[in-house]
Amino acid sequence: MTDLESSKAGLNASEQNASQIEQVGGPNYGRYVLFVLIIVYIFNFIDRQILSILAEEIKLDLGIGDAEIGFLYGTAFAIFYAVFGIPLGRLADVWNRRKLISVGLSFWSAMTALSGFAQNFGHLAVCRFGVGIGEASATPAAFSMISDYFSPKVRATVLAIYSSGIYLGSGIGLFLGGAIVQSWHAWYPDPTLAPLGIKAWQAAFLAVGIPGIAMAVWVWSLKEPIRGASEGLVTPEHPAPFKAAGSSFMSVLPGFSLVALYNAGGLRAVATNIVAAGLVSLLFYGLYVAMPTLLQWVALGIGVYITVTWIHYQKLTDPACYGMMFKSKAFLAVTIGFPAISFVTYGIGFWSPPFMQRFHGESIADAGLYLGLGSAVGGFIGIVLGGIVADYFRAKTVNARLYVGLAIPLLAVPFALGFLYTENIAMAYIYSFLFSVISPAWIGCAASTVNDLVMPRMRATASAYYLLMNTFVGLALGPFLIGQFSDLYNRSGVDSAEALQLAMTWGLGAFALSVLALLLACRYLASDETSRLDRAAALGEPV
């Protein structure tokens, strides 16, 4: 029997078990939940992406450079999003997921609104930390909920539809941000006459943050699905969810993590962790010497150290979950390959509005409108089509989802270069739209592949780790490094428009890493998926 035939046989057996389990809310309720969660994801990315269109206004008002803006958008958000995503992912695996999403939505919306009162770089950074913590609660829990409402056969398509909220939210955020700023300037040409002296960019944060708090009430009303129902692998409720999640929180808090490691593995575990801390410190000191931006490398270094500590703690306390993730070569390759694509999409996506303003002299409203519309429509088409194509061809090859990821660099690079180097404004927007169609086609493929490699009770944890990698590689490094190189070019005498153009061009090089990692994943995915239940049983997991 081939790997594909074995995979199909296992899937059919799971579906037979799943068909005997009555779904919460009836057969169509899952579609309703999906609709609500898409709206949550739209709010998620409005609050995250609006900083892009406000960047030039914030730079002018606070007197900061491209690297600092890249830090605010990327690292300041990403470190807290990624690190808190680990324990919040664990909480999603053992507690009520819709309650977790609702509480998180309230918190990040409040922190977005508070950004509207920021008076300096430090205030805004703290608010971005808070947005990152709140948003970390949503996607791992949503991935897990959706996977329990829909069959594995359509998982890439459904998760792609959910993930369309990324581009719908990003597009709406760009449009709203630009429209609010232009309107505010028209209403209050003298900022001192505005209510409470609020600047245009501050008003934009307030306008998009407050509605999310009301949305949280709607999310609270959703019904929780039966965990594992879609695959006939029902998982019983955890007897002490907050204790389990609390242990995971301890494992990511520096200082407390040493206590957690000692309790789990004794002095040897603590000594190993101290050695790891030293190695991480040396690595990031080297990066600081090469690119002396202290806050960036300290923050990212702490994030990487916390991740290493959590992986070690996971190995000691949940060896089955650790083994299903980190002993799977396909899982490791996928969680490098897809995030490398994210480096490009986050970097190009964030810097596109400032690029249009500098290189083409576009107004903030026009850049927000046309880039936002192109991102929303193009991204929605690309994400959904990517999931549909992957699920269709998966009936023919297990690697179909990976092939979608491998096709993206080949198809996206020409459109990215066209966007960066055409001198025709209309063509720039057309190239941006086409890039928005192609570049996100992998998103549903990545999420479904990660979920299919682990057991149902591990989905949110596995998703949290995948999102952590996606956040570190894509969000923390993409916008920052492009901003850093833009500043370097600018200081060498290149004007700001050309400096940003050159930096964004170099950013496309991350596609090379994605191709190498996904080719490696193609070698192992079929065997790792086929052996999922056997691997779990060998690790002591009840199946």
Where is each model-derived feature located?
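Extracytoplasmic gate region of multi-pass secondary transporters
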Residues: L51-S52, G265-A299, K329-A376, I383, ...
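Extracellular/periplasmic helix-loop-helix junction of adjacent transmembrane segments
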Residues: L54-V83
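Helix-breaking motifs and short loop linkers at transmembrane-helix boundaries and internal kinks
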Residues: G63, N96, F117-H123, G134, ...
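Central cavity-lining transmembrane alpha-helices of secondary-active solute carriers
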Residues: L72-R90, F143, L373-G386, L477
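Conserved MFS/SLC helix-loop-helix module at the cytosolic interface between two early adjacent transmembrane helices
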Residues: V83-G122
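Cytoplasmic membrane-interface "Motif A"-like loop-to-helix N-cap segments
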Residues: V94-L105, D391-I408
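Helix-loop-helix hairpin linking two adjacent transmembrane segments in secondary transporters
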Residues: I166-R227, L261-L300
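C-terminal transmembrane helical hairpin of 12-TM major facilitator-type secondary transporters
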Residues: V398-A446
